[in-house]
Amino acid sequence: MKIFKNLWIVLLVISLLLVGCTSKEKATTETEKETGEQQSYTVVDDRGIELTFEKVPETVVTLLPSITETLFELGVGDKIIGVSQNDTYPEEALEIERVADFETVNAERIVELNPDIVFASASNEGQIEQLESTGLKVFVIESALSVEDVYGDIGQIAQVMKAEEQGEKIVEAIKSQIASVQEKTSTLDKKKNVYFEISPAPEVWSIGSNTFQQELIEAAGIENVFAKQEGWFAVTEEDIINVNPEVIVTTVNFGDDPEGEIMSRAGWSTITAIQNKEVYLIDPDIVSRPGPRIGEAIELMAKTVYPELFK
């Protein structure tokens, strides 16, 4: 069981690194030129590489769930012919061929599919070179660390797919949802603090600053008890007892009763969150994917911690 949990932690951190490694400013400039009746256009990816398209891509492979969700929101999900094993939303994504998992990308299969464009993470460096060597276009998006980064991602993807108007609508809808949440949380006299658990006992992990999840927590009007630390890290049970969180949120749907497992941990009975039974399981996909559901993620966090504001 311990070996299994160790592997689980490694896979979890890999998946989180895919959504939170380096901050960046988005390059979203686009140029067009006339080519007879059709216009070619150029979009710059996060490597600073210009990709020129003679026509709008008709077939797409995406190696990140957040990009898959964005493509569906843009109304071009029907063009996707390959996704990663982690793509679970929307339901239509479950029917698409899997060409990657946590650790590997099936580059040979992607080459066989011969998509017009491959959307990839900067962490797929080796596979990117392999795919590009065959002549495939690969558009690289670095990991988002902030809501602003996500807006930039959506804008870039929309430009590639010539769906800029819909991309702008998605961003405006997200901003509106976040503003609605923050209007409610602005009435709070005092913010609650939270311990955010991303790996179960005995090898407990949490998150701090410079992570996508930290930005969601702050936007939801909540304070992170480990905000002074950076990235993803292991914490001891003594650390958690000492910071005495008012709320505990876990994204670990591990076992039959994740909330009950936390409530019954030895030595935790003095923690305020345990005493007040404020321990909650939250959908890990929504709060770990920097895509079009970030407004929903922030609202979910706020509703979980401050349910009285949403009655």
What are these regions (language model features)?
Residues 59-113, 117-119, 123:
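A short, structured surface patch at a secondary-structure boundary
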Residues 86-89, 205-232:
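Alpha-helical, coiled-coil/dimerization segments enriched in small aliphatic residues
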Residues 59, 155-159, 168, 172, ...:
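Structured C-terminal subdomain patch of bacterial secreted/periplasmic proteins
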Residues 64, 122-123, 143, 229-232, ...:
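Short secondary-structure boundary segments
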Residues 126, 141-156, 191-212, 255-257:
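Extracytoplasmic ligand-binding site segments that recognize negatively charged/polar headgroups
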Residues 46-48, 99-108, 229-237:
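Short helix-initiation/N-cap motifs at beta->coil->alpha
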Residues 2-8, 12, 19-66, 165-195, ...:
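Bacterial Sec-exported substrate-binding components of ABC uptake systems
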Residues 107-115, 133-134, 235-244:
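Short helices/loops that flank or line small-molecule/ion binding pockets
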